[in-house]
Every structure is written in C-alpha cells, then in structure tokens.
C-alpha cells in the first residue's frame, strides 16, 4: 500500500524506485510499452489530488533521487533531487544562512511542490518556490531528456512552474536560495463567535503586516 496524502491511499501493482536518470528513462519506457497501466509519480506523497498513487497501476517513487547540492555559493544556487524532503533541504542550507520557501511541512517532497507553486511561511517576503526556480531537468513521455530554463526550452520552463506534472518527470531542479537570518514563529488559538467579523479582521491584519510576516489561518468546528 502506498499512501498519497493525509486522506488517500492506493495499492499499485508495481512500484519502481529509480536512483538515477537512466533508470527513470527505463521506467518511462516500461510505462509506454504498457499503456493499460495507470501511472503515478511520487516524490513525497502529499499531493491533494492523490495522483501520486493508484490501484493496480505503476508508481514511480522518486524518493531515492534526493540529493541536495550547492552549485554556486556566490549566487546561492542549489540543485535538488525530486525525492528530497524539504526538512532535509532546510537542514543542509541552514549552515549557509539560506532558506528556500517550501510550504509549511518538512515531510513534503521537492518534486511535487516545486512544480505546483510552493506557498509557505516565507512567501510574502521571498515569493513562491517557483518564483526562485532557475532550471529543471525532465524526462518526457517519449524518453527524451531536456533541460528547461529561461535560455533553454523557455516554453517548457514557463509551463513547469505550476503545471510541471503535465509535462514530464522532473529529475532535478535548480533554485536560488534566499538569505534568511532569525525566524520567528507563533501559533495562536481563538474562540470565535462571529466568524464573518473574525475573517474580516484577520484579512486586514494579514494584508497590513510587514512583508516579512506571513499569516496562515486554519479553522475548525
């Protein structure tokens, strides 16, 4: 059984765990030769859609392609494997005084979040994760390998920043990290009687706060 997110799970017939790009190409070839098999691509398994798993099909688990590498210290350019978890990225960048905006939970995989947007606690000041994406390497459905950036395959680069799951399998990404010093975090609880009034007040506070402050709201019964 392969869990997809907090609510979904699946029982795929076959799970492949590539360790390099060549094995990803081979896996794509297998999927192409067996079109009757549903295909899921799994980085961390937290996608809300649940498409990273299935029942009876093929799941390509990218978890072993989890490298975190500083490419260029001066420009803070970092290369990440799609299977890396954001907690590991944060731990690797912390000694440099850097961070990448990466959602709100460390167990999320790089591949899914970085191709879908990436809204997190640093977003108001440093932008979405895709705003800092500089390049992505992909394996396409025909097994070919391409690199997408503003200079190479710019139309693919435009699309991979938000719709990457529709284009191919990302095998690595290059992202510019941001210099981040001390970070403050607080979680507050409120007993709310007038929900409409509270939401209006929260909206005013969130939008008027300094850009260094990001506010999230979770409501429950």
Predicted regions and their residues:
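Glycine-rich N-terminal segment of FAD-binding domains in flavoprotein oxidoreductases
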Residues: 2-66, 74, 80-82
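Short glycine/serine-rich loop/turn segments
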Residues: 5-9, 49-58, 93, 99, ...
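Short coil/turn connectors at secondary-structure junctions
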Residues: 10-12, 34-37, 54-57, 65-66, ...
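General beta-strand structural signal in soluble alpha/beta enzymes
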Residues: 17, 39-43, 60, 70-71, ...
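Structural signature of FAD isoalloxazine-binding scaffolds in flavoprotein oxidoreductases
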Residues: 17, 49-66, 122-141, 169-172
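Short, structural beta-strand-to-alpha-helix junction motif
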Residues: 20, 76-77, 84-91, 107-110
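Short active-site loop/helix that positions an aromatic residue
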Residues: 27, 89-95
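C-terminal cap/substrate-recognition region of VAO/PCMH-type FAD-linked oxidoreductases
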Residues: 99, 136-221
